[in-house]
Amino acid sequence: MNKLRQSFRRKKDVYVPEASRPHQWQTDEEGVRTGKCSFPVKYLGHVEVDESRGMHICEDAVKRLKAERKFFKGFFGKTGKKAVKAVLWVSADGLRVVDEKTKDLIVDQTIEKVSFCAPDRNFDRAFSYICRDGTTRRWICHCFMAVKDTGERLSHAVGCAFAACLERKQKREKECGVTATFDASRTTFTREGSFRVTTATEQAEREEIMKQLQDAKKAETDKTVGPSVAPGNSAPSPSSPTSPTLDPTASLEMNNPHAIPRRHAPIEQLARQGSFRGFPALSQKMSPFKRQLSLRINELPSTMQRKTDFPIKNTVPEVEGEAESISSLCSQITSAFSTPCEDPFSSAPMTKPVTLVAPQSPVLQANGTDSALHVLTAKPASTALAPVAMPVRETNPWAHAPDAANKEIAAIHSGTEWGQSSGAASPGLFQAGHRRTPSEADRWLEEVSKSVRAQQPQASAAPLQPVLQPPPPAAIAPPAPPFQGHAFLTSQPVPVGVVPPLQPAFVSTQSYPVANGMPYPASNVPVVGITPSQMVANVFGTAGHPQATHPHQSPSLAKQQTFPQYETSSATTSPFFKPSAQHLNGSAAFNGVDNSGLVSGNRPAQVPPGTCPVDPFEAQWAALESKPKQRTNPSPTNPFSSDAQKAFEIEL
């Protein structure tokens, strides 16, 4: 019966060892290169392994997969885990496992990721390979059982795939110029180029380009008339009918015969975007990103470009002043640091101050008379710019019963002008009630001023006799303890014009009014021949002598000018004033006080016959010393308000 059964069974082929079948291996090598090599296999599965190479690693993986298959078969009976019947395709690009029935792609393995392949010594038909998983970056071993062939034939076919892949890689390196430089000292290597897998069309294009480059090389070596061979001398391959023809000279400029020129975008796409076209100055030498200095916002090229491209309309015209001498600057510094100011906020309560600023308003007239707020200039000027409006107070806490002296003090004399008003207080101003003792620099400056004054002749001012018209009373600003400014008259009358205020070349001294309306007149003691300590002693010794009356000054004594009294709370005053010229054609009173007590200014100076004209500085100093010493009303909050001081200047 056994023989009868064996007669119906399929007879097995006679076993021929692999070493005696070299003709089959040759066909496998050709099939791998053409991509037509395939083997029917049973895919056992894959497991994770610890190493990337070794036959023992592959054998252990096969044992594990076979043991799992037996375990499931015995536990579940016929429903155990079976090996999948599939077809293994081997090519120079990779290994692909396709299901025999469903034609599904089970495994698609790149040949470059395969690190090791080997047959199994325990199972003749077993074959496995180790690869690196692209997602988990772990070593995975895939195991197969060949159906018709042995594991050695499958391993040989995969080895042929390795060789074909290596040949392609070396060919690409030669074409695209991939170079690897190894540094033994740092145990590193640098690779240049790309190993990207190219398509058949790209490969044909590269072959054509290589032919053109070789032709151009031959033309250079032969030293023909033309520097290069014209493109298109080689017919394009049939597989690439649309292959572009490139100029070989452009490629030879790179000095690399193996380099393949890239396709570049058109010039329109390479142009810069619109956001950068607006600032062409960024590419110049003045770019802030090219210099090592500090970055200033106003000097940025983009800012300067915006200023030039979009000019600001309705700009305010600025008139530059005359150059100042060193002596005038010294006198201004001395005036700013030595002029005391009474504390106006401690003696009387104040209501809310209202500051009116009209920087570009035209000059107004009241009842046909020019405003008393004109700023006089020392040179002819036809353009009339706007004056600076004075701070206005609703109520005057210092307004008492007006008398003749107060009216004369409040009147605007010849040469009245305002300093330039700014949004912040001038740096030369001190806080109200601040006292300052002269320093060594002040004493040195006084000594230098004395020596200069002794050498230079005194400048005389020609008397001006303007006509004063009785103006209507106009309510302007109340008198308050001012920051005293000084002016200096020129020797010729000039028309009344208004220009931005200039700083004087010389600042003379002025009378100093206090809170009760009684001023300290300017000192008139000669300063030649006395020491600075004596000068300080004279000033501080006679500072407490008030003056009951203040006679009107004659135009012949026009060096001494009285300025309008304005608010100290507005913090917009400046102690520096420019030279004044002459009287206004109108006058005004403060707080509605009539100026009927003013004496007409067109009378000449009354000098007794037979006597020389007295210098106004000496006359006022003598008048100051002759008065009895009194104390002003002390402030309840300011302990220094009763000690009034008089600042003086030395005329150069």
Curated annotation (Swiss-Prot):
Q: Say yes or no: keyword DNA repair present.
A: no
The record, for InterPro entries, names: Numb/numb-like, Numb_domain, PH-like_dom_sf, PTB/PI_dom
Predominant location category: membrane
Listed PROSITE patterns: PID
Query: Which of the residues bear the PTM Phosphothreonine?
Result: 102, 242, 437
Q: Does the keyword Phosphoprotein apply?
A: yes
CDD domains found in the cross-reference section: PTB_Numb (cd01268)
* Bias (Polar residues): 550-575, 631-644
Residue list for modification Phosphoserine = 194, 243, 275, 294, 426, 439, 635
Q: What does this protein do?
A: Regulates clathrin-mediated receptor endocytosis. Plays a role in the process of neurogenesis. Required throughout embryonic neurogenesis to maintain neural progenitor cells, also called radial glial cells (RGCs), by allowing their daughter cells to choose progenitor over neuronal cell fate. Not required for the proliferation of neural progenitor cells before the onset of neurogenesis. Also involved postnatally in the subventricular zone (SVZ) neurogenesis by regulating SVZ neuroblasts survival and ependymal wall integrity. May also mediate local repair of brain ventricular wall damage.
Protein name per its UniProtKB record: Protein numb homolog
Q: Which organism is it from?
A: Rattus norvegicus
Which gene is transcribed and translated to give this protein?
Numb
